[in-house]
Structure formats: C-alpha cells, structure tokens
Amino acid sequence: MKRFIIWFVIFVVFITSFVVLSHLYLLKNPQKIAIAIDTSYFMNQNWGNVVNTVKNIAKQKYTVYCLFTDKQLIHSWNSELLSYKLGSVKPYGPRDLEIFYDTSRYREIDEATFVYIVTNDNNFKIKNQLKYKLILLE
C-alpha cells in the first residue's frame, strides 16, 4: 500500500506541474487569430450574421485577436475581440478578397497563427488550408 501511495503522489505532482506549466506557457504565448471580414456590397444580405459569427470565433482561450476588413484595420492584437466596433462598418463597394493575402497592407496576417475569412462568396478558394479558414455565411 505504501508503494501505491508513493506512486500516486508522484503521479499527482507530475500532472499538476504539467497543467500549471502549460497554463503559464499559453498565457505568455497565446495563439494569434486574425479575423478578416468581407465588407463588399454582396455582404448586405448576410451582414446581420457577421457579429454573431465573430463572437463565436472569439470564445477561444489563450488567444489574442485582430479584426480587419477588406477596406480597413478595425483593431490590432487585443486579448478581447472588440466586435462592437463592427457597428460602424457598413458593406459597400466591390469584392476583393485577395486583399486578405496582402501582408504589406496588413502585417497582422504574417503574425497570425490562423486567419478566419468571413464571407458569403461560394467561389472563393483558400490558398493555404493550414493558416486560412473560410467561414461561409448563408
């Protein structure tokens, strides 16, 4: 019985230290998620779903967020996704989703672990399946 208790204590200490160290590491090195929103005229029909979609993405732990559209940067890296700033954005103009690959315009694209592209364009093809995730609004 004594041997079991010793092994049990070692096991509990090992697991606890692993969890604590993982937590501390993830706090210092959070995932960077960039959310790119299509604000073309064609998004008018789905614009009501955009804020809820963005809020659903923002429920992840150990993450910092960046929010931008094809026309402007809404906010750079922040621990909270400031989706309320989308209230001032209105869909207008032509669709140009290739801008979401332009790292000279948005340096956050290079820094991001993942880039979520929110659009309703069924014909848009993702170039890098590992980094870019397409969210199609119906």
PLM region descriptions:
Residues 49-67:
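An active-site-proximal "capping" alpha-helix that borders the catalytic cofactor pocket
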Residues 20-22, 52-54, 100-104:
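A generic local structural motif
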Residues 68-118, 122-125, 136-138:
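Von Willebrand factor
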Residues 3-23:
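Hydrophobic membrane-insertion alpha-helices, especially the h-region
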Residues 28-30, 58-62, 106-112:
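Flexible, charged surface loops at secondary-structure boundaries
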Residues 26-49, 120:
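MIDAS-like acidic motif and immediate structural context at the N-terminus
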Residues 24, 130-138:
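A charged, solvent-exposed segment within the mature domains of Sec-exported extracytoplasmic proteins
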Residues 48-49, 128-130:
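Short amphipathic alpha-helical segments
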